[in-house]
């Protein structure tokens, strides 16, 4: 096996999955290109804003992709290249892309509402409350972690063992480029909104802005401390998560999506030119140093195969920007397929190194291994290794920031929706609900808690992120499966992914509880492990409650009347 064969297999499977299985889902569920989407029906200039396909795709792709599809396959490579490749391809086509498409489809068919509202409408209010509370806490954790990672990536200074402080040009370059992206995004947003140019002209402008920002960042690095970046990042998130999507979110993600696409294209060219050999075993063992392939492989490789976080983006922000129902497939299913391709490239990258070779070259983190491999590939055609390495590192590092305001916006929406039911009279809310549903209050409380968590140590509960993320996938699949059944659509294709991910998540949480519970009974636990144990138990209880409610609805002999949304016709 070599890199080219892996790449060809991936292109055929992923491309075929989109062309055949994606379109099959479209036909079975029913797409009405003439239907008025929530982006038009509820247009408010803030969250509900119709946008062209390429712009919404840019938002979806930039929000869900980044370091995740790079880190996961490289970490999971301890089990061998074959199980990793199979899970990326099968998971991407039949699990992840289906979940993302179903989440967006259900949201668009229900006035752009989140999965929480779908659960209330078709499963029950208790399930909705539990889901939204979980989503809100999940978003707080992700914002805290990503903000800390970004602050570290942007940190312009480093201390050596002797206490000498020196500047880090690479970090400074990433910081400058990322800040320029924000400034350019505002300018591009004005162009997109007011100039009304041809989409190809807009694309050309975006590419010029992208190149200019990268070049300027390389030549003029910005040096600020980690603590300063922490404060600046949270100020940015506060503004970005309440600003109209046309002002920053849409154009910024549009810009960043091109950076990611260029990186993927360059990597594919590099693989075909260099044809790297595969230095990994096809399969090592089911148990590697105490880590069992089931469920660890399926929790570790989330982005790139199936990730619950994607359902929050699909139903929380992207669905409110869909201009036509026919755009849902390329935006949701298509973005996931692209991310799976990035995950395959990451697998090829780590497989290209012989045992110990990456560490010998000073490549210690997953993004560094990825960047080092791509630089090796492109060096074959004469591109400078150091330049390519820097550019790839810059591209990967810059993407952590792109997810931050999307996650914060989803967290804000989850907090607001927690206090509103489907039958709530918005004109006669009690005072506490008026305060809680205010977008500024809900954003501030979400970000204040995230900031405090980032400062006191989110790392104590971060090991549960993988299980929590996949639990989101389980809940989203359950909600979508029930929605499809209640609206007389064919949703059986969601059952296998739903049951499999349920087994993965509950097994992972159960193993964590057994391990930490055993330690607690014998030697006691540290504060961090105690928090992990508590959160693992709470997550398992939450998952079981919502799963039982959903399965009851799915197995009802007498189906409820068709959906309560304004649609009766299913297109064949």
Q: Which ranges hold each PLM region?
A:
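Hydrophobic alpha-helical segments and their helix-loop junctions in multi-pass secondary transporters
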Residues: 189-194, 208-231, 239-241, 246, ...
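Juxtamembrane transmembrane-helix boundary signature
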Residues: 14-41, 60, 90-116, 196, ...
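Membrane-interface "cap" regions at the ends of multi-pass membrane proteins
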Residues: 16-70, 257, 321, 570
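Extracellular/periplasmic helix-exit of transmembrane alpha-helices
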Residues: 271-285, 337-373, 406
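Extracellular loop-to-transmembrane helix junctions
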Residues: 2-19, 76-107, 116, 175-185, ...
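Membrane-interface helix-loop-helix modules in multi-pass membrane proteins
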Residues: 51-110, 121-125, 142, 147-158, ...
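Membrane-helix boundary/coupling elements in multi-pass transport proteins
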Residues: 67-74, 91-99, 103, 107-111, ...
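Loop-to-transmembrane helix boundary motifs in multi-pass membrane proteins
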Residues: 125-140, 334-341, 388, 417-455, ...
């Amino acid at each position: 096996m070599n890199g080219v064969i892996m790449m060809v297999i991936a292109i055929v499977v992923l491309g075929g999955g989109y062309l055949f299985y994606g379109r099959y889902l479209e036909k079975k569920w029913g797409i009405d290109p003439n239907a008025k989407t929530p982006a038009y029906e509820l247009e408010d200039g803030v969250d509900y804003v119709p946008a062209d396909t390429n712009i919404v795709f840019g938002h979806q792709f930039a929000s869900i992709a980044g370091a995740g599809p790079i880190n996961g396959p490289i970490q999971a490579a301890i089990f061998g290249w074959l199980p990793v490749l199979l899970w990326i391809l099968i998971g991407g086509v039949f699990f992840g892309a289906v979940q993302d498409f179903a989440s967006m489809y259900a949201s668009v068919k229900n006035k752009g509402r989140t999965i929480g509202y779908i659960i209330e409408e078709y499963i029950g209010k208790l399930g909705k409350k539990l889901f939204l509370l979980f989503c809100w806490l999940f978003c707080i954790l992700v914002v805290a972690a990503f903000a800390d990672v970004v602050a570290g990536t942007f940190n312009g200074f480093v201390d050596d063992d002797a206490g000498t402080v020196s500047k880090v040009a690479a970090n400074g370059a990433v910081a400058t480029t990322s800040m320029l992206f924000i400034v350019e995004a505002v300018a591009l947003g004005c162009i997109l909104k007011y100039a009304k140019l041809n989409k190809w002209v807009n694309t050309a402008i975006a590419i010029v802005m992208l190149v200019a920002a990268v070049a300027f960042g390389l030549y003029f690095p910005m040096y600020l401390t980690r603590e300063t970046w922490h404060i600046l990042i949270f100020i940015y998130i506060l503004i970005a998560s309440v600003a109209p999507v046309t002002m920053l979110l849409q154009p910024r993600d549009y810009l960043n999506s091109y950076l990611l696409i260029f990186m993927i294209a360059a990597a594919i060219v590099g693989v075909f030119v260099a044809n790297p050999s595969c230095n990994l075993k096809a399969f090592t063992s089911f148990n590697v140093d105490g880590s069992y392939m089931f469920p660890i492989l399926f929790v570790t490789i989330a982005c790139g195969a199936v990730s619950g976080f994607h359902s929050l983006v699909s139903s929380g922000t992207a669905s409110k920007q869909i201009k036509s129902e026919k755009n849902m497939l390329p935006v949701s299913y298509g973005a996931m397929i692209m991310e799976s391709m990035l995950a395959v490239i990451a697998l090829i990258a780590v497989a290209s190194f012989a045992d110990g070779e990456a560490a010998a070259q000073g490549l210690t983190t997953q993004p560094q291994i990825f960047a080092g491999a791509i630089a090796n590939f492109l060096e074959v055609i004469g591109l400078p290794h150091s330049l390519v390495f820097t550019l790839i590192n810059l591209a990967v590092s810059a993407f952590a920031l792109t997810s931050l305001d999307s996650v914060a916006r989803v967290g804000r929406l989850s907090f607001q929706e927690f206090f509103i039911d489907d039958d709530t009279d918005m004109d006669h809310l009690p005072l506490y609900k008026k305060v809680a549903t205010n977008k500024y209050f809900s954003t501030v409380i979400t970000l204040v808690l995230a900031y405090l968590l980032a400062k006191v140590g989110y790392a104590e509960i971060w090991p549960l992120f993988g299980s929590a993320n996949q639990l989101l996938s389980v809940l989203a699949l359950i909600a979508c499966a029930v929605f499809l059944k209640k609206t007389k659509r064919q949703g059986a294709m969601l059952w296998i992914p739903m049951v499999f991910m349920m087994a993965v998540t509950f097994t992972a949480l159960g193993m964590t509880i057994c391990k930490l519970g055993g330690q607690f009974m014998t030697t006691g636990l540290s504060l961090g492990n105690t928090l992990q144990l508590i959160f693992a138990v709470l997550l398992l209880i939450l998952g079981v409650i919502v799963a039982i409610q959903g399965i009851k609805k799915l197995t009802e002999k007498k189906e409820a009347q068709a959906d309560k949304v304004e649609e009766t016709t299913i297109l064949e």
